[in-house]
């Protein structure tokens, strides 16, 4: 292999690496909500009519799906009762089964994984370190799972990075959505143009009915909006 060809290959590899890391670099660089709003020119919508997908005209749950959601809830409660869930157990025990019951692994949906990114959250006493795992559904719905080895991070901790992911969507002319989960809580985010809004926090650990609501929101977003 001559020197010129080797040089071209190296250049192509470097270009590919830069391309695949662009979104990752942006999400790592943005650590606060004010940074995300300033960088992307975003503002939070206070209109109740902006994000109706999480509460208005939600789909009915058939008996089979309700039974599967109950099994999922009881299984998660069983494992959660043993203490804080570490590493990828939230993804394994809660998020992936929820996506399965919602039918999001079947045509026409395709799911891809983004590279995990680190997250640091500072409070008055210490800096909490964790990780964000990301799944993307048809470049319209981002599934964000927060994990921490020492303590549970609030779902709000990943909102700045989530907005960065949504802004990087190739479908910027249409609304995009995200579901943030840390195991105990789930919250949905909508971005449309330069405005965003969040749902109320759903707490499946406290109320099984809120796991059903999360399922309903997923179904509505993916089957009506995507």
Where are each of the predicted segments found?
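A short, conserved, highly charged catalytic patch centered on acidic carboxylates
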Residues: 8, 13-175, 187-226
């Amino acid at each position: 292999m001559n020197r010129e060809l080797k040089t071209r290959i190296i250049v192509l590899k470097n270009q590919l690496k830069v391309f695949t890391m662009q979104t990752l670099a942006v999400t790592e660089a943005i650590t606060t909500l004010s940074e995300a709003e300033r960088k992307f020119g975003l503002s939070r919508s206070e209109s109740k009519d902006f994000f109706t997908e999480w509460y208005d005209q939600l789909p009915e749950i058939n008996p089979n799906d309700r039974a599967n959601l109950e099994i999922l809830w009881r299984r998660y409660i069983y494992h959660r009762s043993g203490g804080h869930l570490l590493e990828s157990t939230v993804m394994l025990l809660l998020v992936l089964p929820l996506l399965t019951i919602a039918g999001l692994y079947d045509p026409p949906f395709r799911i891809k994984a983004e590279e995990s990114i680190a997250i640091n959250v500072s409070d008055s006493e210490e800096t909490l370190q964790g990780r964000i795992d990301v799944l993307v559904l048809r470049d319209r719905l981002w599934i964000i799972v927060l994990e921490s080895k020492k303590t549970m991070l609030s779902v709000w901790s990943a909102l700045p990075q989530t907005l960065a992911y949504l802004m990087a969507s190739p479908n910027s002319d249409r609304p995009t959505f995200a579901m943030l989960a840390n195991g105990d809580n789930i919250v949905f985010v909508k971005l449309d143009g330069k405005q965003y809004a969040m749902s109320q926090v759903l707490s499946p650990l406290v109320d099984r009915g809120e796991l059903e609501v999360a399922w309903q929101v997923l179904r509505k977003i993916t089957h009506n909006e995507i």
